[in-house]
Curated annotation (Swiss-Prot):
Family of the protein in this entry: Belongs to the orthopoxvirus OPG108 family.
Function summary: Envelope protein that binds to heparan sulfate on the cell surface and might provide virion attachment to target cell.
Induction: Expressed in the late phase of the viral replicative cycle.
Transmembrane segment boundaries: 285-305
Protein name as catalogued: Envelope protein OPG108
Gene it is expressed from: OPG108
Cellular localisation: Virion membrane
Length: 324
């Protein structure tokens, strides 16, 4: 009996072909070899094999899929993932990105994986790049042996951590540390049953509120879920903030500042990614990002000190129309 392949699922967060997440393997993986799976669908059996004569990079271990479900812009059937407060106050980008993952965990596809006794799934958002996937085989074996439920492959907070050996061999030296409130859905490996249990608990509790990361950490504690974070994960999974920053500017109303922002995103991707990160929604009418918050504080400053410069008010107005 053939071994069950581990699904590698690409979740689109920007307009980009799924194969660009794996740039060095176009001879094995191209866009036609990615199955598109969406809501109420299961994986077709024909994609069980990637045909290559030799497999030094382990690509026969996996079946490659692009998840196209969970689009909250299509309809409102994903509102049950969020509380009434979050549906009003959480930003559109936050809800959109979280809904994609929760809809995947809650899909018929994941139920089918559980029925087929598939233990783990690798999930990668398409603003990441993985140039060498040979680390996945020993990592999957190690997290099975160590009973790890979730391996997060993007670090949110760096610093001194108590690290534990995960994989030590001639090719890889990988360590992990226990996750807390530093939750990221950018790139991770998750046990199928764990994903099903988490999304079931979220729905039963009335949906996520604004504190998504705190709630996920709370659920993990209550359900005794072992989530580890890969130390120095950028060595294996490279997140490109430029792609998201450019995407945010491209989806803004075309104006002078959006054009300036697109250019700045190429030169200062990390800074522009941070500045364009949405913080809160104003009752679902519009989202306020970091730049928008700075503009609001600047307006308050000008009102308090009764600034009468027409140029400053004009420039502030252009920022308001562009970023708020």
């Amino acid at each position: 009996m053939a071994a069950v392949k581990t699904p590698v699922i690409v979740v689109p967060v920007i307009d980009r072909p799924p194969s660009e997440t794996f740039p060095n393997v176009h001879e094995h993986i191209n866009d036609q070899k990615f199955d598109d799976v969406k809501d109420n669908e299961v994986m077709q059996e024909k994609r069980d094999v990637v045909i290559v004569n030799d497999d030094p990079d382990h690509y026969k271990d996996y079946v490659f899929i692009q998840w196209t479900g969970g689009n909250i812009r299509d309809d409102d059937k994903y509102t049950h993932f969020f509380s009434g407060f979050c549906n009003t106050m959480c930003t559109e980008e936050t809800k959109r990105n979280i809904a994609r993952h929760l809809a995947l965990w809650d899909s018929k596809f994941f139920t089918e994986l559980e029925n087929k006794n598939v233990e783990y799934v690798v999930i990668i958002e398409n603003d990441n790049v993985i140039e060498d996937i040979t680390f996945l085989r020993p990592v999957l074996k190690a997290i099975h042996d160590k009973k790890i439920d979730i391996l997060q492959m993007r670090e949110i907070i760096t610093g001194n951590k108590v690290k534990t050996e995960l994989v030590i061999d001639k090719d890889h030296a990988i360590f992990t540390y226990t996750g807390g409130y530093d939750v990221s859905l950018s790139a991770y490996i998750i046990r199928v049953t764990t994903a099903l249990n988490i999304v079931d608990e979220i729905i039963k509790s009335g949906g996520l509120s604004s504190g998504f990361y705190f709630e996920i950490a709370r659920i993990e504690n209550e359900m005794k879920i072992n989530r580890q974070i890969m130390d120095n994960s950028a060595k294996y999974v490279e997140h490109d903030p430029r792609l998201v920053a450019e995407h945010r500017f491209e989806t803004m109303k075309p104006n002078f500042w959006s054009r300036i922002g697109t250019v700045a995103a190429k030169r200062y991707p990390g800074v522009m990614y941070t500045f364009t990160t949405p913080l809160i929604s104003f009752f679902g009418l519009f989202d306020i990002n970091v730049i928008g918050l700075i503009v609001i504080l600047f307006i308050m400053f000008m009102l308090i000190f009764n600034v009468k410069s027409k140029l400053l008010w004009f420039l502030t107005g252009t920022f308001v129309t562009a970023f708020i």
